[in-house]
Amino acid sequence: MTPTETFYEVMRRQGVTRRSFLKFCSLTATALGLGPAYTSEIAHAMETKPRTPVLWLHGLECTCCSESFIRSAHPLVKDVVLSMISLDYDDTLMAAAGHQAEAALADTIERYKGNYILAVEGNPPLNEDGMFCIIGGKPFVDQLRYAAKHAKAIISWGSCASHGCVQAARPNPTRATPVHQVITDKPIIKVPGCPPIAEVMTGVITYMLTFGKLPELDRTGRPKMFYSQRIHDKCYRRPHFDAGQFVESFDDEGARRGYCLYKVGCKGPTTYNACSTIRWNEGTSFPIQAGHGCIGCSEEGFWDKGSWYARLQDIHQFGIEANADQIGGTVAVGAAGAVAAHAAVSALKRAQTKRQTTTTTTPKEHV
């Protein structure tokens, strides 16, 4: 199996039928949110485009992005790693180690200059000349710059590479730095999350291989196809938010009924991600469905934004559960206040008019 083979050629060699291949393309189009009309375009790309070499680097991180990636169901990670791409370097997954691993990295960079994708998990620390993270006897930041020099594009996996994450939380003693602040001359796509959703990760790769370009990005560099909506927008608990039905404390009656978690710190209203639509573990669940509020892990600096259990802000709404007496009482108080204010303004105007009249009619003294 070589990088010059196409995905379809690899699939055929593995005994996959044409029908199964087209089914795969259809599922991929659906997973990317493109619809069935793009099935033929994806099939054509898989049949004609050679497998792209990918180098996957690891800096300061916990490897949760890799753990998420290997659990992708649409497409299956085995299809991505063994057929769609040529994963030439990943020190977590590859069999080679030491000098052999470093030789594989150098060989791919030399043979495919300008034609490989660099995926980065984790970030480089810059304090002490980068000595807080050593790969192959050298600072990781040096390996990053070396691999990025001839890369076609860079994918920043997870919040570590995209924003800095916990390593960059105050006071950030190692000066952990997001990839885009170190590499400034390459197209970079950010896929934040701690970790990102598996199907989001494989979906980004599939899109880039199919269309030969980065997906449309938002102003922060994230793919709009997965980060254009707040979790709150599609959350199944949203009707409870609109109704004013909230969990006041964990394990109260509202929690048992599945009410909105906003008051116990859910960051869904300010977090852009696909958790409430794609979900996790092959679409099984996501944190809010499990009873815990969103912590906003795909947003920049979420570690430094206060407690995960502090509400974002107070809200003032009746909610459809408010009864007529409550609403009527509130309206009556408001009306009474308005009448009092009107009376006060009228009294001031009368007093001002009286003073002006008195000044006008007073006779002048003779000198």
From Swiss-Prot:
GO terms for cellular component: [Ni-Fe] hydrogenase complex; ferredoxin hydrogenase complex; plasma membrane. [4Fe-4S] cluster 1 binds at C62, C65, C160, C194. PROSITE patterns: TAT. The keyword Transcription does not apply. Gene3D superfamilies: Cytochrome-c3 hydrogenase, C-terminal domain (4.10.480.10), NADH:ubiquinone oxidoreductase-like, 20kDa subunit (3.40.50.700). Its cofactor is [4Fe-4S] cluster; [3Fe-4S] cluster. Coiled coil: none annotated. Keywords: 3Fe-4S, 4Fe-4S, Cell membrane, Iron, Iron-sulfur, Membrane, Metal-binding, Oxidoreductase, Plasmid, Signal. Its EC number is 1.12.99.6. Belongs to the [NiFe]/[NiFeSe] hydrogenase small subunit family. Heterodimer of a large and a small subunit. NCBIfam families: hydA, TAT_signal_seq. This is Uptake hydrogenase small subunit. It comes from Afipia carboxidovorans (strain ATCC 49405 / DSM 1227 / KCTC 32145 / OM5) (Oligotropha carboxidovorans).
